[in-house]
Amino acid sequence: MVKIEEGLPSSEISAHSLHFQHHHHPLPPTTHHSALQSPHPVGLNLTNLMKMARTPHLKSSFSINSILPETVEHHDEDEEEDVEKKSPAKFPPNHNNNNLNTTNWGSPEDHEAESDPESDLDVTSMSPAPVANPNESDPDEVDEEFVEEDIECDGETTDGDAENKSNDGKPVKDKKGNEKPPYSYNALIMMAIRQSSEKRLTLNGIYEYIMTNHPYYRDNKQGWQNSIRHNLSLNKCFVKVPRHYDDPGKGNYWMLDPSAEDVFIGGSTGKLRRRTTAASRSRLAAFKRSLIGPMFPGLAAYPQFGQFLTYPPTAPSLLASMYQRYNPFAPKGGPGHPGLPPGLPGLPGPPGPQGPPGPPPPPFVAPPTSSELYQRLQYQQLLHQHAAAAALAAHQRQLSVAAASAASQPPPTHHHPHLAVGQAPLSPGGDSPGPSPQPLHKPVTVVSRNS
């Protein structure tokens, strides 16, 4: 930045002006008059360029070029304003734009050339990033519709699992020419356990199987054993079983989890896959039906629980017998109503010889909770009391029938109906023979004892 002081002679001003021009941008050899007039038209050219830069570009996307040049040119504009303030009216205004073609740094073509790399950078573009190799395709995406819980069963989280193929697409080979098997560590572990005689192996047994069947790992022992241990610990398909104290040897056994029955090894990827989830879901639903169906018959009122209650007839009856044995307070389902015992009214009433059964209570409309279980317990106690009262009434009726049959053995008289009830009138005169006293006092004695 050149500072021009007032009071300097015109020759010094021209020298400073020439120094200003040659310091910033070299010019071709011109006359002294053009050198004196060049600084001010340059400022006008900068103003025109700033206006051109501020004009919005007719593009569909936002460009960084509309931001960065404006900030740079604001700084140049401030410098020119300072120069113009300190040198007022020293140079006559020249509206000739011939210097636009002579200056290299004031041409709009050079300015556009400098901003071309920036204008190509689109900030707001929603286009995806370029793919490194479009020919590469993830094999997991092909089998995605057939795979479920793949991360859970085949999580390659180890650093020792290298690529099975080199950069040129050929299989990886060691110094002896042994190819690396196209299987993941989880697949190797599953093959080792499934092909064992007892369906279980120790860690050393898994190592031995891998090195025996795949010589590549026998000759290259760099980190793959640590990866095997890592996958055994993290994968849910493998379960650690402690060794029995009578079993000699060291280390725990590793077995396959029962949920890994549908897991197989993919032929194209060499990783673990689940065959179909429909079979596993059907087995899980059948298991839930076998558990929930017999225990909660009141859920039949809910249509959303129908799938759990319509269990097949091949469900084990042992579960129902154990439920009846260990849960005596749960009501037994009858043919008429599933939640009440057969042949009993809904609410306990006074015992009667031939009382009609009361109306059945409304069906269960709520899933069993703790309060409902408590109500069932109270209801069961009431049922026991009602059953005891009904048994006592039946016993009394049986005794009365026995007394009536015993009283009907003598010749029939007019007093026999009264005797059957138990009222034996005493003959005041004693002239009537009267029945035998033993049948008369037998029902009275039995009734008084039970009462």
UniProtKB/Swiss-Prot annotation:
| Top-rank taxon | Eukaryota
Alphabetical list of InterPro entries matching this protein: Fork_head_dom, FOXG1, TF_fork_head_CS_1, TF_fork_head_CS_2, WH-like_DNA-bd_sf, WH_DNA-bd_sf
Is Ligase there in the keyword field?
A: no
Compositional bias (Low complexity): 94-104, 419-430
Q: Which GO terms describe its molecular function?
A: DNA-binding transcription factor activity; sequence-specific double-stranded DNA binding
Does the record carry Transcription regulation as a key word? yes
Q: Which GO terms describe its biological process?
A: regulation of transcription by RNA polymerase II; segment polarity determination
Q: DNA-binding region at which residues?
A: 180-274
Provide the function of this protein: Transcription factor involved in segmentation. May function primarily as a segment polarity gene. Different levels of slp activity seem to be required in different segments.
Protein name as annotated: Fork head domain transcription factor slp2
Species of origin reads Drosophila melanogaster
Q: Which gene encodes it?
A: slp2
